[in-house]
UniProtKB/Swiss-Prot annotation:
Organism (species): Listeria monocytogenes serovar 1/2a (strain ATCC BAA-679 / EGD-e)
Localisation: Bacterial microcompartment
Chain residues that bind CoA: A27, S28, G29, K73, N194
UniProt name for this protein: Phosphate propanoyltransferase
Highest taxon in the source lineage: Bacteria
Binding positions (Zn(2+) 2): H140, H142, H187
Amino acid sequence: MNNELITSLIEEVTRRALLETGVEVEASGRHVHLDRETVDALFGPGYELTHFRDLSQPGQYVCKERISIVGPKSVIHNVVILGPIRKKTQVEISSTDGTALGIKAPVRESGDIAGTPGILLLSAKNSVQLSEGLIVAKRHIHMTPADAEKQQVSQSEIVQVKINGDRPLIFDDVVVRISPDFATYMHIDYDEANACGFKKGIRGQIIKKTKAK
């Protein structure tokens, strides 16, 4: 048995053991996903965003570039851009950010932006006024098919997640997203992170709202 196979087996055993204790939770700060048209408008035709750091989800990354978002009441600077480029531009903030900006953003799943408020985006040289795309991301779990089978959950199922931190609580209305392209993590925003006393590496226990089939 070679070292690579041994390492792979150890990683799989560790993953399964951790899954028994729930899913790891990550807190996501405000960020934007840009489409090709918006990148061109903000940074120039054909501009390529600069990869800075990988995220936990395979193929997703933080870009070096930053922008500002402008609402009726205030401006938030140094907003992170996530890559790669999306089909439609989307801005994800917390409810607290929305209050500061003076815009009430609805709670939506990623990609569900029809009828949402717009917002002004500013780069160092240019601006883009979005007609829609501002949301508060619905809390969710990215999950691999193998982990979903182990947890006995299905695509788009709504579950509860119990967080045993310094301020233990149960998050309701958590949507499960399943794909072989995912890594298994729950994502909450900073408002939710503050509510549960979030610390890096904290885990959540999935509570099914319906009986497993």
